[in-house]
Each structure stands twice: as structure tokens, then as C-alpha cells.
A protein has these predicted regions:
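Short, acidic/turn-prone active-site loops that include or flank metal/cofactor-
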Residues: 15, 128-130
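Short acidic capping loops at alpha-helix termini that bridge into adjacent secondary structure
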Residues: 6-7, 134
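Short acidic/glycine-enriched loop/turn segments that link adjacent beta-strands
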Residues: 22, 97, 131-134
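Residue-level "edge-of-site" marker
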Residues: 51, 99, 130
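Short, conserved loop/helix-junction motifs that constitute active-site signature segments
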Residues: 1-5
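Conserved PLP-binding catalytic core of the aspartate aminotransferase-like
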Residues: 75-76, 80, 85-120, 136
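PLP-dependent aminotransferase class I/II
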Residues: 7-86, 91-94
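Active-site catalytic microenvironments in core metabolic enzymes, especially phosphate/sugar-handling
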Residues: 125
Length: 138
């Protein structure tokens, strides 16, 4: 896709799929000119430069394909189970391959659900934008 479209950038974080949240490790793939432009300004938006330790850990994570596949499969299984449970509770959502579910309940306002969940120390995101007002990011 990056060869077909010069304005497409594919980014990957190691936070969830490689269990390295907080390490600030990831990469971007895209048109060489787009990557160069990002490199030219990277210190203005990236306040977490990669250390030698971060690079070594990132390389080790990439080389451990078995762990990555097991973690990825567990994330997918958990997401699909959660979608089934949410659907049974009256939620609707689009098909997504992300690590979150953007859901709307058929009869209960999202803000009400958000407040009730927060009271139980369950944290989801609620949005107030016009087109996504009644959705939760779970």
C-alpha cells in the first residue's frame, strides 16, 4: 500500500502486541520522502528518543516471533469474546481489527454507561463529538 500511495504511513507500536507499553518503541513504513520529512522534524514531536537499551529490547522482541504470535492470538480471542458479550448486552459496533471496540448501546445513553462504569472503577472512553456522541471506546 505504501508503494501505491505516497501519502500512506503505516505505524506499529510495540505497546500491546509485544507487551512493551511504556518503552516508546515502534516504527513507521512509508514513502521514502514521507519518512525523510518525519525524520527532519522528529525531535519536535518525539520527546522519547530511543536508547541503546530500547533498540536492543525492540530487536529482541521482533526476533521472538513465537511470543508475538501467541500474544496477538490472545488479543484477538479476547476482543472477539468481548464483542460477543457486548452484543448479548445490546451493543452494536463495526467490524474492527484494532485492540479496542468502538461501541454504541441500542437503548442506553453512552454517558450513562460511562458514569456507571467509572463508579465501579472500569475505565472506558466516552466522546462528545457530533457524529460519535453516543459511542464508547472499550
Amino acid at each position: 500500500m505504501t508503494k501505491e500511495y505516497d501519502n500512506v504511513l503505516i505505524v506499529q507500536t510495540f505497546s500491546k502486541s509485544r507487551s512493551m507499553a511504556g518503552m516508546r518503541i515502534g516504527y513507521a513504513m512509508g514513502n521514502p520522502e514521507l519518512i525523510k520529512a518525519m525524520n527532519d522534524v522528529r525531535f519536535s514531536y518525539n520527546s522519547y528518543p530511543m536508547t541503546r537499551l530500547s533498540v536492543a529490547l525492540g530487536v529482541a522482541a521482533i526476533e521472538d516471533e513465537d511470543y508475538f504470535q501467541a500474544t496477538k492470538n490472545q488479543i484477538i480471542e479476547t476482543r472477539e469474546w468481548t464483542k460477543r458479550e457486548l452484543k448479548a448486552l445490546g451493543f452494536t459496533f463495526g467490524d474492527s481489527k484494532t485492540n479496542f471496540i468502538f461501541a454504541k448501546h441500542s437503548t442506553v445513553d453512552a454517558e450513562v454507561i460511562f458514569d456507571k462504569l467509572r463508579e465501579k472503577h472500569i475505565f472506558v472512553r466516552h466522546f462528545s463529538g457530533e457524529r460519535i456522541r453516543n459511542y464508547l471506546r472499550i
